[in-house]
Amino acid sequence: MNNPDDVLLINRFLRQQHVLTLCAGSGMDMWCASCFYVFDENQMALFLMTEKHTRHSELMLINPQVAGTVATQSRTIALIKGIQYRGEISLLSGDAEQAARNRYCRRFPVAKVSSAPLWQLNLLEIKMTNNALGFGKKLHWSRVEPL
């Protein structure tokens, strides 16, 4: 069972940030990328835009299981906050793609000139470090319902 207080803090953090590190892999081939994202807390999902011909996208099309981080850049140890996540990503199409694109372009207006596809990263597991709550404080969330 997810702790409601942890969920509130995790959601607030994901709403406040906008860049994630995404790690994809298949077999011995792995690659990471930094991407802008929009958080959908109702679905516990992140929407991101990236071309299909990139190395990380080609890997995601083979293996949709991904992992990554969302972190602040604090120079003060007591203020460090960050998330490690595991999820499943899929390329959007049709109405779902258009809805995600509209939402993404509202957050990042410069994206209106891009035709790059939108992806939905369904979060499966999150561990958040929040030193503002005490050094090394960890918050956890995991998806309880199947996708």
From Swiss-Prot:
Domain of life: Bacteria
InterPro entries hit by this protein: Split_barrel_FMN-bd (IPR012349), UPF0306 (IPR011194)
Disulphide bridges, residue numbers: none
Family matches, as NCBIfam families: PRK03467.1
Family stated for the protein in its record: Belongs to the UPF0306 family.
Protein name, per record: UPF0306 protein YPO3467/y0717/YP_0616
Organism in which the protein naturally occurs: Yersinia pestis
Upper lineage: Bacteria, Pseudomonadati, Pseudomonadota, Gammaproteobacteria, Enterobacterales
